[in-house]
């Protein structure tokens, strides 16, 4: 069964590219251009979440959303990867309970390796 990857990023170009890449690799991409709520994530119940740290127009940062996800019993086992162009991403990921991080711009091979690691 195809794994569902929730991508939350305010960059339309990144969403478009990831949609193509993930679909070609056999995943089901679920794309959100703005932030989403924990309740919405409960309904979607993805197998992996790629979460931008800075989401324009949303009151919470990606790491705040990640922390909320990890506090929810039914969502806490879903792997979350933070994504950002920021340098200090490793510490932010650790602090919010994320499973890892990816720096922008993406290296597609590294991205797919991380995705496969968490969706095996």
What are these regions (language model features)?
Residues 61-64, 86-103, 113:
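Alpha4 helix (beta4-alpha4-beta5 surface) of REC/receiver domains from two-component response regulators
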Residues 107:
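Receiver (REC) domain switch/active-site region of two-component response regulators
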Residues 44-55:
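Active-site beta3 strand of CheY-like receiver
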